[in-house]
Amino acid sequence: MWGRGFLQRARFAQLSPSSSSSRSLLSAASAAPPNLLYSHYQRGRWFGCSTANMAPVRDPNTLSNYDAWRTRHTTANLKIDFTAKCLRGSVILELESQTDKASKEIVLDSSYVTVNSIKLNSAPSLWETKARTEPNGSPVHIAVPEGAAKGEVVKVEIELATTDKCTALQWLTPAQTSDKAAPFMFSQCQAIHARSLFPCQDTPDVKSTYDFNITSPYVVVASGVPVPDETKDLGEEKLYKFQQKVPIPSYLFALSSGEIASAPVGKRSCVCTGPNELKASQWELEGDMDKFLEAAEKIVFPYRWGEYNVLVLPPSFPYGGMENPIFTFATPTIISGDKQNIDVIAHELAHSWSGNLVTSCSWEHFWLNEGWTMYLERRILASIHGGDAHFDFSAIRGWKALEEAIKEYGEDHEFTKLCISHKGIDPDDAFSTVPYEKGFHFVWSLDRLVGRENFDKFIPYYFGKWSNKSLDSYEFKDTFLEFFSAPEYSDLKDKIASIDWEGRFHSTGLPPKPEFDTSLADVCYELAEKWKSKDFTPSPSDVASWTGNQVLVFLNAVQDFEEPLTVEQSQALGKAYGLSESKNAELKAAYYHIAMRSKDASAYQGVADLLGEVGRMKFVRPLFRGLNKVDRELALKTFEKNREFYHPICRQMVEKDLGVSEAANSS
Ligand SMILES: [Zn+2]
């Protein structure tokens, strides 16, 4: 995912609008005293095996007994009901017994989902939904009176409907889409929201193949390969079929439906989005998709999923992106008219290997997904844009984000560890940039330790060995040590023995800081220095050869000046570098923050206009806070005007920021 902390805050706000996100983090941390860390995990690893060869439950965020039963195939027969805003239908789980008739019940995760009936091997069965506990929800217990022989597969068919408390689905009104003609829906199951769609073994430690049979009045996209010949007309509705033949964890189950058009953007890729955005989206991605895929394949090995498509969500999508297989779900702010923000796509594509093919077995080892993905993303982009300086430039930006995150948590905080105990913790609450950037730094440190040439041989070995499987940090360590114990690497023996695995996995705070190649960043800071002088005359050529991210680093440096720019300087900045006219929301937003700080009133309407075009919280919340400081009336007017356009989570956050929420009024 590419959410960078926003998901966690948004979710918390939704549940408890009057509390601050930092409080949730503190209370979450205090819920897990240090002596309990990893106890669940260790119990599973050391003592949990009651039957020989049975893999233990090692994910504290599931209540399922997946040590006794494992889902092998899932069939989702679901109807998307836009009027009632729910999914209804049946889901069939095919579970393989891991014991020899020892287990007499199947326990599944569920959360705010209505179960109407459950059949076991086509016969009505005894089942019960047990009381809800946080953060893991309400387990569904299904009796299997005779048990099943080891290796035998039983079929569990569940009739169900989602509820209005479902945490996995977002329903947009026509007003929240760009052509305002039809409603739109999409799912977001990471981390533990799949259980809110249907009862399942909602753990990344279990992988299943999928059949999707989805009925909707609008076009459907799912995390499987479309089976177009089998789309059936059912009067007002259509049945859309998809297949996912690569086993995937539950958090990668994904659906979206609405007025969706598609256009090719590469040999294996199409872009799907609203008809109004199709042309611009196609232009933005065309040409680069094949390059990204080829670069990634060169680093790891050939792409194994068939198609790689991108679904660009409506402007009110509040997040960055989600690596749902076959169809990455992406923020529309990547469509910036300058191809400068599509690094999100390199990130989500990299997940096709790290995360989707090779998966962390629980959210405690999430860095295996995101740290590796940041590493691959930077390798992909460096190979396309030309080398190490680009890699380091991106890593420098990441390091800054990591420093900020660790500063915000406090450097002793549990959530600043690479491996984070999740006992009693909702993974969304522990979500931050830490697993991304601290994970990246660990992977990169191993790369530098053994040398690029050697590390490049390890990469396909690791991803090959763990394809279609899930692993923990210790299995990663074992794999690394095993690979480099080969005789041809004997000269690396001392270096490898020097790796502080325990320190890397369990220390809080920043990891050791590497030497960066700062050449691409230095020019940004040098230009910013020049702007400190009031008589500096800017010229478009100052930034003409720069990437969008370089301009961003420069703008952030200017924003951090002790003294704001004068109104004249700020206007000259916008004009000389084409910032006020830019379609790039990243650059435009950064510029408007400088303009607002300079009290350049001529820019305020531009801020208001931008706030009517983007719904990604990364931009919306800071812009509203900025506008509120300089022109509260315009801020309130802009919010009222766009209220229906924003996603409910975003709307609620902005209400709080502007002090117009009901909670704020009553307190
Ligand atoms: Zn990611």
From Swiss-Prot:
GO terms for biological process: cytoplasm to vacuole targeting by the NVT pathway; lipid metabolic process; peptide catabolic process; protein catabolic process; proteolysis. Binds 1 zinc ion per subunit. Its EC number is 3.4.11.-, 3.3.2.10. One of its GO terms (cellular component) is cytosol. Zn(2+) binds at residues 347, 351, 370. Keywords: Cytoplasm, Hydrolase, Metal-binding, Metalloprotease, Nucleus, Protease, Zinc. Its cofactor is Zn(2+). SUPFAM superfamilies: ARM repeat, Leukotriene A4 hydrolase N-terminal domain, Metalloproteases ('zincins'), catalytic domain. InterPro entries: Aminopeptidase_N-like_N (IPR045357), Aminopeptidase_N-like_N_sf (IPR042097), ARM-type_fold (IPR016024), LTA4H (IPR012777), LTA4H_cat (IPR049980), M1_LTA-4_hydro/amino_C_sf (IPR038502), M1_LTA4H (IPR034015), Peptidase_M1 (IPR001930). One of its GO terms (molecular function) is epoxide hydrolase activity. It catalyses: an epoxide + H2O = an ethanediol. CDD domains: M1_LTA4H. The keyword Nucleotide-binding does not apply. It is found in: Cytoplasm; Nucleus. NCBIfam families: leuko_A4_hydro. PANTHER family: LEUKOTRIENE A-4 HYDROLASE (PTHR45726:SF3). Aminopeptidase that preferentially cleaves di- and tripeptides. Also has low epoxide hydrolase activity (in vitro). Can hydrolyze the epoxide leukotriene LTA(4) but it forms preferentially 5,6-dihydroxy-7,9,11,14-eicosatetraenoic acid rather than the cytokine leukotriene B(4) as the product compared to the homologous mammalian enzyme (in vitro). This is Leucine aminopeptidase 2. It comes from Neurospora crassa (strain ATCC 24698 / 74-OR23-1A / CBS 708.71 / DSM 1257 / FGSC 987).
